[in-house]
C-alpha cells in the first residue's frame, strides 16, 4: 500500500489565464503564492499557484478545460451570506445556493470555464 499523507495541490485547467487570474485573485480574493510562471518549453502556457490555508490551489492554461463535470474544489469562507452576495453582484453563475446540512452550509458556483466551486461554511460543532 502507498502511504499518501496529504493532497499536494489541486489544479484547474483554464482557457484564458488573465480572466482566470482576475476571477480567483480579485473576485474570490485568493492570495497569489508567488508562483506565476510561464511553463518552460510551452510558450504562452502558465501555471499560477495560490496558498489557501495548508493547501495549494493552481490554475493553468497548459490544457483546455473539458466543459464536462469533473473535479470540484471547496473554499471555506468566514461569511457565506456576504460571499454569495458578492458573487451574485459580479454575475457569477450559481448551480445551487442556500444548501444546508447538519455540519455546513454552502453554495455551488462555476468559474468562467465551467469548473465547479463550492463556497462553504462549516457550522460550529455542538461541543464548542
Q: Could you say what each language-model-derived stretch is?
A:
Residues 45, 59-62, 94:
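A generic local structural motif
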